[in-house]
UniProtKB/Swiss-Prot annotation:
It comes from Corynebacterium jeikeium (strain K411). It is found in: Cell membrane. The lineage of its organism: Bacteria, Bacillati, Actinomycetota, Actinomycetes, Mycobacteriales. Its main location: membrane. The keyword Nucleotide-binding does not apply. The gene is atpF. Keywords: ATP synthesis, Cell membrane, CF(0), Hydrogen ion transport, Ion transport, Membrane, Transmembrane, Transmembrane helix, Transport. This is ATP synthase subunit b.
Amino acid sequence: MTNTFLLAAEKLPMEESVNPLIPPLYDIVWSIIPFAVILFVFWKFVLPKFQEVLNQREDQIEGGIRRAESAQAEAKAALEKYNAQLAEARTEAAQIRDDARSQGQKIIADMKAQATEESNRIVESGHKQLEAQRSAVVTDLRKEMGENSINLAERLLGEQLSDDVKRSGTIDNFLAGLDNVGASGK
């Protein structure tokens, strides 16, 4: 089979051999005419539409970029506003906390003052009650001592002391003497 191809190749004359890369002239002419028509149609109708679509696309992309930039700027402004509000809220919270602390200290001081006043009042009331009880006890003791001394004096003297004025004078003199002795002994 190889021999057949070789024999077929030898029979062709050399000058008639055609270059497969360069087509004949009539093919080139008839190829240029439809190419020019297609190029004209493409140039006149397709390319403007294509350019219009590309321009719309470009406008959409640029508009999207502008919208994204404006949205980013708005977001940044909102973030700054939020941070400012947060800082203001923290400052206000610190001020409220300080006010509450000072009010708490004031309330504590007021309560201590009230407690001190109440304590002093209770102590004073206690002193008054003790003084009243002491006076009552002293009065009762004087009365009992007076009666006991009269009974003792009647036993010693062997007679009854009948005069109440005399009795009370004797008792008062005796108790005054005891008070003087008690006061000088202190």
